[in-house]
Amino acid sequence: FDFQFRPFTKLYSTFGLRSDEHSTVGRKNSGRVTLAYLLDGNSKIRSSFGAGVRFPALYDYAYGDSTIVDKGGKLEDLQSERGLSFDLGYDTYLDNLDLELSVTLFKTEEKNSLLSNARTSWVIANASGVNTSEGIELSGVWKPVDKKISLNFGYTFIDSYDAATCDADEKASYTDGECHDKGSKLDSAKVRVPRHAIQSKINYSISPMLKGSLSGKYVGETRDFGNGNTGGCCFGYVDQILSDYYVFDLVTTYKIFNGFQATFNIGNILDEEYEQAYQYSSMGRTFNFGIRRIYWSHAKLINDFKKRDSSN
Protein backbone atom coordinates (compact mmCIF):
# COMPACT_ATOMS: atom_id res chain seq x y z
CA PHE A 1 0.00 0.00 0.00
CA ASP A 2 0.97 3.63 -0.39
CA PHE A 3 -0.30 6.22 2.07
CA GLN A 4 0.03 9.95 1.42
CA PHE A 5 -0.66 12.45 4.15
CA ARG A 6 -0.03 16.07 5.12
CA PRO A 7 0.46 16.39 8.89
CA PHE A 8 1.17 20.14 8.70
CA THR A 9 0.50 22.86 6.16
CA LYS A 10 4.07 22.87 4.84
CA LEU A 11 4.93 19.22 5.45
CA TYR A 12 4.13 16.50 2.93
CA SER A 13 4.88 12.83 3.48
CA THR A 14 4.29 9.37 2.05
CA PHE A 15 4.61 5.90 3.51
CA GLY A 16 4.67 2.76 1.40
CA LEU A 17 4.93 -0.90 2.36
CA ARG A 18 5.16 -4.00 0.19
CA SER A 19 5.16 -7.67 1.16
CA ASP A 20 6.29 -10.38 -1.28
CA GLU A 21 5.96 -14.14 -0.90
CA HIS A 22 8.63 -16.25 -2.62
CA SER A 23 8.07 -19.98 -3.05
CA THR A 24 11.58 -20.80 -1.79
CA VAL A 25 12.83 -17.85 0.24
CA GLY A 26 9.55 -17.05 1.94
CA ARG A 27 7.96 -13.71 2.77
CA LYS A 28 10.02 -10.52 2.72
CA ASN A 29 8.94 -6.94 3.31
CA SER A 30 10.15 -3.69 1.78
CA GLY A 31 9.07 -0.10 2.13
CA ARG A 32 9.77 3.59 1.69
CA VAL A 33 9.16 6.82 3.60
CA THR A 34 9.43 10.31 2.10
CA LEU A 35 9.19 13.80 3.59
CA ALA A 36 9.12 17.25 1.99
CA TYR A 37 8.99 20.54 3.87
CA LEU A 38 8.20 23.80 2.09
CA LEU A 39 10.41 26.63 3.33
CA ASP A 40 8.69 29.21 1.13
CA GLY A 41 7.12 29.41 -2.30
CA ASN A 42 10.42 28.63 -4.04
CA SER A 43 12.36 26.34 -1.69
CA LYS A 44 11.92 22.98 0.01
CA ILE A 45 13.84 20.34 1.95
CA ARG A 46 13.17 16.71 1.08
CA SER A 47 14.30 13.33 2.30
CA SER A 48 13.55 9.66 1.77
CA PHE A 49 14.48 6.33 3.33
CA GLY A 50 13.82 3.01 1.68
CA ALA A 51 14.47 -0.71 2.10
CA GLY A 52 14.38 -3.05 -0.90
CA VAL A 53 14.70 -6.73 -1.65
CA ARG A 54 15.80 -8.87 -4.61
CA PHE A 55 14.95 -12.55 -4.62
CA PRO A 56 17.28 -15.16 -6.15
CA ALA A 57 16.74 -15.59 -9.90
CA LEU A 58 16.53 -18.87 -11.79
CA TYR A 59 20.15 -18.31 -12.80
CA ASP A 60 21.15 -18.25 -9.13
CA TYR A 61 19.37 -21.54 -8.51
CA ALA A 62 20.70 -23.27 -11.64
CA TYR A 63 24.25 -21.96 -12.07
CA GLY A 64 25.64 -24.75 -14.29
CA ASP A 65 27.41 -27.39 -12.19
CA SER A 66 28.05 -24.89 -9.41
CA THR A 67 24.62 -24.73 -7.80
CA ILE A 68 24.38 -24.81 -4.06
CA VAL A 69 22.55 -28.15 -4.30
CA ASP A 70 25.41 -29.72 -6.29
CA LYS A 71 27.74 -28.71 -3.45
CA GLY A 72 25.62 -30.36 -0.76
CA GLY A 73 23.38 -27.44 0.17
CA LYS A 74 19.68 -26.68 -0.24
CA LEU A 75 17.86 -24.12 -2.36
CA GLU A 76 16.48 -22.68 0.87
CA ASP A 77 20.06 -21.72 1.82
CA LEU A 78 19.94 -18.87 -0.70
CA GLN A 79 18.49 -15.74 0.87
CA SER A 80 17.28 -12.56 -0.79
CA GLU A 81 19.57 -9.60 -1.33
CA ARG A 82 18.74 -6.58 0.80
CA GLY A 83 19.24 -2.89 0.17
CA LEU A 84 18.90 0.34 2.13
CA SER A 85 18.91 3.87 0.72
CA PHE A 86 18.75 7.34 2.24
CA ASP A 87 18.85 10.80 0.70
CA LEU A 88 18.53 14.37 1.89
CA GLY A 89 18.04 17.21 -0.57
CA TYR A 90 17.37 20.91 -0.98
CA ASP A 91 15.61 22.51 -3.96
CA THR A 92 15.22 26.20 -4.65
CA TYR A 93 14.31 28.62 -7.42
CA LEU A 94 16.00 32.02 -7.64
CA ASP A 95 13.51 34.39 -9.27
CA ASN A 96 15.99 37.17 -9.95
CA LEU A 97 18.30 34.78 -11.82
CA ASP A 98 15.67 32.49 -13.42
CA LEU A 99 17.73 29.67 -11.91
CA GLU A 100 16.58 26.37 -10.43
CA LEU A 101 19.09 24.62 -8.15
CA SER A 102 19.09 21.26 -6.42
CA VAL A 103 21.53 19.46 -4.12
CA THR A 104 21.17 15.90 -2.81
CA LEU A 105 23.22 13.85 -0.38
CA PHE A 106 22.72 10.11 -0.67
CA LYS A 107 23.89 6.79 0.70
CA THR A 108 23.02 3.21 -0.27
CA GLU A 109 23.94 -0.19 1.13
CA GLU A 110 23.51 -3.63 -0.40
CA LYS A 111 24.06 -6.79 1.62
CA ASN A 112 23.54 -10.55 1.23
CA SER A 113 24.84 -10.22 -2.34
CA LEU A 114 24.39 -13.35 -4.43
CA LEU A 115 27.68 -14.14 -6.15
CA SER A 116 30.22 -16.84 -6.88
CA ASN A 117 33.80 -16.26 -5.74
CA ALA A 118 36.57 -17.76 -3.62
CA ARG A 119 34.95 -17.24 -0.23
CA THR A 120 31.75 -18.97 -1.42
CA SER A 121 33.82 -21.88 -2.83
CA TRP A 122 32.86 -20.76 -6.36
CA VAL A 123 29.19 -21.51 -5.75
CA ILE A 124 26.36 -19.02 -6.06
CA ALA A 125 25.74 -18.04 -2.43
CA ASN A 126 25.09 -15.03 -0.21
CA ALA A 127 28.30 -13.17 0.59
CA SER A 128 28.88 -11.48 3.94
CA GLY A 129 30.16 -8.14 2.64
CA VAL A 130 28.25 -4.87 2.38
CA ASN A 131 28.50 -2.84 -0.84
CA THR A 132 28.15 0.89 -0.29
CA SER A 133 27.74 4.06 -2.32
CA GLU A 134 27.56 7.58 -0.97
CA GLY A 135 27.98 10.98 -2.47
CA ILE A 136 26.39 14.19 -3.63
CA GLU A 137 24.44 15.33 -6.68
CA LEU A 138 24.26 18.94 -7.83
CA SER A 139 21.97 20.06 -10.64
CA GLY A 140 20.58 23.24 -12.06
CA VAL A 141 18.39 24.65 -14.81
CA TRP A 142 18.84 28.19 -16.05
CA LYS A 143 15.88 29.22 -18.20
CA PRO A 144 15.49 32.99 -18.59
CA VAL A 145 11.97 34.18 -19.20
CA ASP A 146 11.31 35.26 -22.80
CA LYS A 147 14.81 34.21 -23.88
CA LYS A 148 15.84 31.81 -26.63
CA ILE A 149 18.49 30.06 -24.57
CA SER A 150 18.47 27.71 -21.58
CA LEU A 151 21.11 25.68 -19.75
CA ASN A 152 20.99 22.40 -17.82
CA PHE A 153 23.94 21.20 -15.77
CA GLY A 154 24.76 18.56 -13.19
CA TYR A 155 27.59 17.06 -11.18
CA THR A 156 27.75 13.72 -9.35
CA PHE A 157 30.35 12.50 -6.88
CA ILE A 158 30.17 8.84 -5.79
CA ASP A 159 32.40 7.20 -3.20
CA SER A 160 31.66 3.49 -3.61
CA TYR A 161 33.01 0.26 -2.13
CA ASP A 162 32.97 -3.15 -3.81
CA ALA A 163 32.72 -5.71 -1.01
CA ALA A 164 32.46 -8.58 -3.50
CA THR A 165 36.15 -8.31 -4.41
CA CYS A 166 37.66 -6.06 -1.73
CA ASP A 167 36.58 -7.48 1.63
CA ALA A 168 39.46 -8.88 3.66
CA ASP A 169 38.11 -12.45 3.75
CA GLU A 170 37.74 -12.51 -0.05
CA LYS A 171 41.28 -11.23 -0.61
CA ALA A 172 42.62 -13.74 1.94
CA SER A 173 40.83 -16.68 0.31
CA TYR A 174 42.16 -16.14 -3.20
CA THR A 175 45.06 -14.27 -4.76
CA ASP A 176 44.26 -12.48 -8.00
CA GLY A 177 44.69 -9.10 -9.60
CA GLU A 178 41.47 -7.60 -8.28
CA CYS A 179 41.23 -4.83 -5.71
CA HIS A 180 44.96 -4.23 -5.36
CA ASP A 181 46.02 -1.43 -3.01
CA LYS A 182 47.88 1.36 -4.78
CA GLY A 183 46.77 4.26 -2.63
CA SER A 184 43.82 5.33 -4.79
CA LYS A 185 40.15 5.39 -3.82
CA LEU A 186 39.44 3.73 -7.16
CA ASP A 187 41.22 0.55 -6.01
CA SER A 188 38.16 -0.57 -4.04
CA ALA A 189 35.44 1.29 -5.98
CA LYS A 190 32.56 -0.48 -7.66
CA VAL A 191 33.33 -1.58 -11.19
CA ARG A 192 32.38 0.96 -13.90
CA VAL A 193 31.16 3.51 -11.35
CA PRO A 194 33.12 6.77 -11.78
CA ARG A 195 33.84 8.96 -8.77
CA HIS A 196 33.24 12.15 -10.75
CA ALA A 197 30.76 12.86 -13.56
CA ILE A 198 29.65 16.17 -15.06
CA GLN A 199 26.97 16.77 -17.67
CA SER A 200 25.65 19.94 -19.27
CA LYS A 201 23.32 20.92 -22.09
CA ILE A 202 22.75 24.25 -23.83
CA ASN A 203 19.43 24.64 -25.65
CA TYR A 204 18.87 27.41 -28.19
CA SER A 205 15.74 28.29 -30.10
CA ILE A 206 17.05 29.82 -33.31
CA SER A 207 13.51 30.37 -34.58
CA PRO A 208 10.05 28.96 -33.82
CA MET A 209 10.79 26.26 -36.39
CA LEU A 210 14.49 25.58 -35.74
CA LYS A 211 15.93 24.45 -32.41
CA GLY A 212 19.32 23.13 -31.41
CA SER A 213 21.16 21.82 -28.39
CA LEU A 214 24.78 21.14 -27.52
CA SER A 215 25.40 18.63 -24.74
CA GLY A 216 28.62 17.56 -23.11
CA LYS A 217 29.68 15.21 -20.38
CA TYR A 218 32.82 14.41 -18.46
CA VAL A 219 33.39 11.01 -16.85
CA GLY A 220 36.30 10.59 -14.47
CA GLU A 221 38.62 7.62 -14.11
CA THR A 222 36.80 4.34 -13.51
CA ARG A 223 37.78 0.92 -12.21
CA ASP A 224 37.12 -2.17 -14.32
CA PHE A 225 38.16 -5.83 -14.32
CA GLY A 226 40.92 -7.10 -16.57
CA ASN A 227 40.53 -10.14 -18.82
CA GLY A 228 42.52 -12.89 -20.47
CA ASN A 229 43.86 -10.48 -23.09
CA THR A 230 45.54 -8.21 -20.55
CA GLY A 231 48.64 -10.32 -19.95
CA GLY A 232 50.82 -10.34 -16.87
CA CYS A 233 49.96 -12.05 -13.62
CA CYS A 234 46.76 -13.81 -12.63
CA PHE A 235 46.04 -14.90 -16.22
CA GLY A 236 45.56 -11.24 -17.09
CA TYR A 237 42.73 -10.66 -14.65
CA VAL A 238 44.25 -7.55 -13.14
CA ASP A 239 42.14 -4.50 -12.35
CA GLN A 240 42.33 -1.71 -14.90
CA ILE A 241 41.73 2.03 -14.45
CA LEU A 242 39.85 3.43 -17.44
CA SER A 243 40.92 6.94 -18.46
CA ASP A 244 38.64 9.91 -18.01
CA TYR A 245 37.01 11.40 -21.11
CA TYR A 246 34.88 14.20 -22.54
CA VAL A 247 32.09 13.73 -25.09
CA PHE A 248 30.09 16.43 -26.91
CA ASP A 249 26.93 15.94 -29.02
CA LEU A 250 24.93 18.30 -31.23
CA VAL A 251 21.20 17.90 -31.92
CA THR A 252 19.10 20.09 -34.23
CA THR A 253 15.43 19.84 -35.15
CA TYR A 254 13.39 21.69 -37.77
CA LYS A 255 9.62 21.66 -38.08
CA ILE A 256 8.70 21.18 -41.72
CA PHE A 257 4.90 21.02 -42.02
CA ASN A 258 1.87 19.07 -40.79
CA GLY A 259 3.71 17.51 -37.86
CA PHE A 260 6.78 16.49 -39.86
CA GLN A 261 10.13 17.21 -38.27
CA ALA A 262 13.65 16.94 -39.68
CA THR A 263 16.54 16.07 -37.37
CA PHE A 264 20.29 16.34 -37.80
CA ASN A 265 22.63 15.07 -35.10
CA ILE A 266 26.39 14.84 -34.64
CA GLY A 267 27.50 12.42 -31.96
CA ASN A 268 30.93 12.61 -30.32
CA ILE A 269 31.81 15.81 -32.17
CA LEU A 270 35.50 15.73 -31.22
CA ASP A 271 35.83 12.06 -32.21
CA GLU A 272 37.01 11.19 -28.70
CA GLU A 273 38.42 7.70 -28.16
CA TYR A 274 37.21 6.31 -24.85
CA GLU A 275 36.09 3.15 -23.07
CA GLN A 276 33.12 2.62 -20.81
CA ALA A 277 34.19 -1.01 -20.34
CA TYR A 278 37.74 -2.35 -20.57
CA GLN A 279 38.78 -3.11 -24.19
CA TYR A 280 35.32 -2.21 -25.53
CA SER A 281 35.75 1.00 -27.50
CA SER A 282 32.84 3.38 -27.97
CA MET A 283 31.68 4.86 -31.25
CA GLY A 284 33.61 7.71 -32.80
CA ARG A 285 32.08 10.72 -34.52
CA THR A 286 28.68 9.94 -36.07
CA PHE A 287 26.26 11.84 -38.30
CA ASN A 288 22.53 11.14 -38.34
CA PHE A 289 19.76 12.68 -40.43
CA GLY A 290 16.11 11.77 -40.29
CA ILE A 291 12.51 12.84 -40.78
CA ARG A 292 9.76 11.87 -38.41
CA ARG A 293 6.06 12.53 -38.03
CA ILE A 294 4.73 13.79 -34.71
CA TYR A 295 1.08 12.83 -34.35
CA TRP A 296 0.53 14.55 -31.01
CA SER A 297 2.36 16.60 -28.45
CA HIS A 298 1.99 16.96 -24.71
CA ALA A 299 0.47 20.44 -25.09
CA LYS A 300 -1.96 19.24 -27.76
CA LEU A 301 -2.98 16.29 -25.61
CA ILE A 302 -3.79 18.61 -22.69
CA ASN A 303 -5.83 20.90 -24.96
CA ASP A 304 -7.75 17.93 -26.32
CA PHE A 305 -8.62 16.82 -22.79
CA LYS A 306 -9.72 20.36 -21.87
CA LYS A 307 -11.97 20.54 -24.94
CA ARG A 308 -13.47 17.16 -24.10
CA ASP A 309 -14.10 18.15 -20.47
CA SER A 310 -15.68 21.48 -21.45
CA SER A 311 -17.99 19.75 -23.91
CA ASN A 312 -19.19 17.42 -21.15
Predicted feature residues:
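Residue-level signature of outer-membrane beta-barrel architecture
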Residues: 3-5, 19, 27, 37-38, ...
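Outer-membrane beta-barrel signature, preferentially recognizing the C-terminal barrel domain
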Residues: 38, 42-44, 51-110, 117-144, ...
